[in-house]
Amino acid sequence: MDIAIHHPWIRRPFFPFHSPSRLFDQFFGEHLLESDLFPASTSLSPFYLRPPSFLRAPSWIDTGLSEMRLEKDRFSVNLDVKHFSPEELKVKVLGDVIEVHGKHEERQDEHGFISREFHRKYRIPADVDPLAITSSLSSDGVLTVNGPRKQASGPERTIPITREEKPAVTAAPKK
């Protein structure tokens, strides 16, 4: 019986490490997909390519959670932390960085025992005062961290244009 051996460069000539089987790219609040647990199958076809993980839309993309926004009048971060109680969360400002940390110890759920921990850091834009940043936790588990953006210094004004009779650029004398 012959066994076909497919070299990874032949199967994926342009992206040999494009979509490895891995568990470390999860979002902390998301569940595993069944395809995350199995290696890419070469038994189906030598030309089978596992769909890359960035093409699969995670569930938070539909809800708009875990995002950072910079709007005209404010800066905000929305983060899905439904698996954590307010006592298990910390929000700190360190210089120009917001640090969000969540941790809960091992506890039992319907599937067994679970513990979770995450750290997220967000750079504060230059026009946001770090002392004015606030945070709140909604009833559905969305942590919102926001701060007002500084307004421009003074009202807008129009500057009149005057016309001059002399040219701005003069020709250099030829040697």
UniProtKB/Swiss-Prot annotation:
GO terms for cellular component: cytoplasm; extracellular region; lysosome; nucleus; protein-containing complex. It comes from Bos taurus (Bovine). Lens as well as other tissues. Gene3D superfamilies: 2.60.40.790. Glycans are attached at S41, K90, K92, T170. The modification N-acetylmethionine is found at M1. Heteromer composed of three CRYAA and one CRYAB subunits. Aggregates with homologous proteins, including the small heat shock protein HSPB1, to form large heteromeric complexes. Inter-subunit bridging via zinc ions enhances stability, which is crucial as there is no protein turn over in the lens. Interacts with HSPBAP1 and TTN/titin. Interacts with TMEM109; in the cellular response to DNA damage. Interacts with DES; binds rapidly during early stages of DES filament assembly and a reduced binding seen in the later stages. Residues 56-164 form the sHSP domain. This is Alpha-crystallin B chain.
